[in-house]
Amino acid sequence: ACKFELIDGELETLWPDAPGLSERDRRRGRHLACQCRALGPLRIKASAGPEYVPRIRPTRRSARLAGIADLTHDLREFRFVTDSAADFLPGQYAMLDLPGVGASRAYSLANTANGAGEWHFQIRRVPHGRGTHVLFDTLKVGDSVGLDGPYGVAWLRTDAPRDIVCVAGGSGLAPMVSIARGAAEAGLLKDRRLHFFYGARTPRDVCGEAQLAPLDGFGERIRYVPVVSLPGDDGAWQGETGT
């Protein structure tokens, strides 16, 4: 969604091998805006279709860390609060400026828009990751970071009449939980179903049910299906398996 063609200027590519670009894209000088840093003025060519026009204008603001909760052994929910309302669409993300990291990090939101200014992120620890090292090991409740957003076009379409299918794995849980919560709040599940599939490596990596269970219709119109690829040899896992 953030693909563009560089016409003139210089930039730094933060992730040269990002899977969002094909070899054809690279030959044509295309880049991913979320993985680039401008080194000066740029001229670019990008799609300007109506789907890329922000429904909510991104805004930079200061956010205070208000709470941390463990979801699994390596997945945590970080709750930030801003002075202004948290205005975003279910499924969108925001950029966090973390102290000492140098570059912003993009993290999906897990909650829904609210007037209390609460922004919830469900983030998985990345081994040797600079951003998650700060979040997991350095940042304390009460500390402030920069927050820029919202961004993203993969948000909940409330006008689609079909059932909703959410597929997530790892920290990809966050945007799907946001979409499920948004669908429930909008009353979309009164006449349709939501199927939520969560893939994990082992049983201890599974989560998501606790976030979905409070929603109206859970177990009836909301179906949660966890799947693991390494169930173990003890026979304790009784759920679905797959690769």
How would you label these PLM feature ranges?
Residues 1-32, 36, 193-243:
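Reductase modules of NAD(P)H-dependent flavoproteins
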Residues 7-10, 47-49, 99, 150:
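Short, surface-exposed secondary-structure boundary micro-motifs
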Residues 19-53, 61-69:
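Short Fe-S-cluster ligation motifs
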Residues 53-143, 162, 200-202, 227-231:
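Ferredoxin-reductase
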Residues 149-162:
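A short, basic/flexible loop-to-alpha-helix module at the beginning of a structural domain
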Residues 163-179:
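A phosphate-binding catalytic loop at a beta-strand-loop-alpha-helix junction
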Residues 177-187:
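Histidine-anchored nucleotide/phosphate-binding helix
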